[in-house]
């Protein structure tokens, strides 16, 4: 019976591990118990988690580790077994994790020396071959203070009391929930570190990146997309599709190309699909650690596709924006003219402040004094009994623009610019509900306004009368011109008719219309519609028949035998 440190240890060789392991092993938890061992005469159970490293691949892995209870630090660079004491029981340690592990309550009553669990929680008892490589167990701690450098006995004793999770560093790509297991290993229990370095940094994953000054000035970021890890260089970052800032397998990719390589080509936002330290790159952008460029940036970084050395231009940083809804845009456009109209009323009201400051509660119930005066004088009769309605009064700039276009250019027009502001109306707003506000208006001012309106209407009446007279004169002149043209045309037609009647050929044809209509065509024997214009004797139905019969008819057509062959034949229709 031998008792060591009030606890017993079970050492398993490589053959026993190969008999119980699986070909895809992600985690190894070595449980030590005192129920089935021949050295079990101790009074306290001390559970230990062993970190097993390979002698072939991890020669520079764990250079030294310290034990909290034994106080001994090992410097073995080769493969070995390092015992890390844990003060918490194994049940609370396993149940507090987020990995796929089996709690001790689910184990059979007899002792299980080793439990092999992969990421899918699949248990295997078959014998598989592991080769010469063993996996590494990582103990993640929530430290109250950042872990320091190389391992010592005192640091180990203070940092091993907060172990609550068990992770795995399988191939450097990360565990199930966090890809940065190397950083987690630096904060492991006991402050264990390698030969050439020490683990530093924050231990809690809930702290922001802005709180860590090393992240703010970091040039290379270890990023991950799904299960693929790569390096992102801050100085080469452009936008999603421009700027080859991701180095993966000695090749440079843009963030979008890296997503496609990782199988996330259908992703819509590269800033959220690419992770760093368990967080998306969007969190780094929000905190100002990374600053992407705009999509239309023309700097050297964004134009490094083929000839990036010769490209130059300003750096346009990406500025997020929020689109306005269509309803808000419509409301803004509709409210614009309303504000302008209110401004116009306010300008008119400023000239009559003595009448507008009487009440503020009934501002909506207002009446226009000018409209009331116009209603009272709806019709005005001048000296020529001409009625004028309010609709005849138009704007002061060009009241008779439509009539000016129809007048003759020789007509004398009235210069409207010399009339001044005769059509400008003054507006007085009176509250209907308040009777005292109506009495405030001065009688002289009211009479002055009525006189002004009357003068304006009389002026418009005179202008309308003048324009009407000018239009009548222009109309009469045009009627005279048209009458003269009609008389000249009638006289010309009479002269032409008398000349046609005196012509014997035309008179003979007029008297012989009935005879021609009874004749037949000399060529086709159809009803004749015309006759030869040379001899006025041979009828034809068309020009075609006349041309066809001309060789035989030219002998008979002897009106002028000397010029028979030179005459131009014309067909005269009997209906003309």
Swiss-Prot record:
Residue stretches making up the SAND domain: 210-291
Subcellular location per the Swiss-Prot or TrEMBL entry: Nucleus
Keyword Transcription part of the UniProt annotation: yes
Residue spans of biased composition, Gly residues class: 61-76, 191-207
One Gene Ontology MF term: DNA-binding transcription factor activity
Gene Ontology process terms (BP): embryo development ending in birth or egg hatching; positive regulation of DNA-templated transcription; regulation of immune response; regulation of transcription by RNA polymerase II
Binding site for Zn(2+) 2: 532, 535, 553, 557
Bias (Low complexity): 345-362
Gene name tied to this protein: Deaf1
Primary location class: nucleus
Region (Disordered): 52-76, 189-215, 309-362
Residue span of motif Nuclear localization signal: 324-340
Keyword Nucleotidyltransferase attached: no
Protein residues bound to Zn(2+) 1: 521, 524, 541, 545
Keywords per UniProt: DNA-binding, Metal-binding, Nucleus, Transcription, Transcription regulation, Zinc, Zinc-finger
Alphabetical list of SUPFAM superfamilies matching this protein: HIT/MYND zinc finger-like (SSF144232), SAND domain-like (SSF63763)
Protein known as: Deformed epidermal autoregulatory factor 1
Zinc finger (MYND-type): 521-557
Function: Transcription factor that binds the homeotic Deformed (Dfd) response element. High affinity binding sites contain at least 1 TTCG motif surrounded by additional TCG sequences. May be involved in the selective action of Dfd on these sites without binding directly to the Dfd protein. Requirement of DEAF1 activity may be a common feature of enhancers targeted by Dfd.
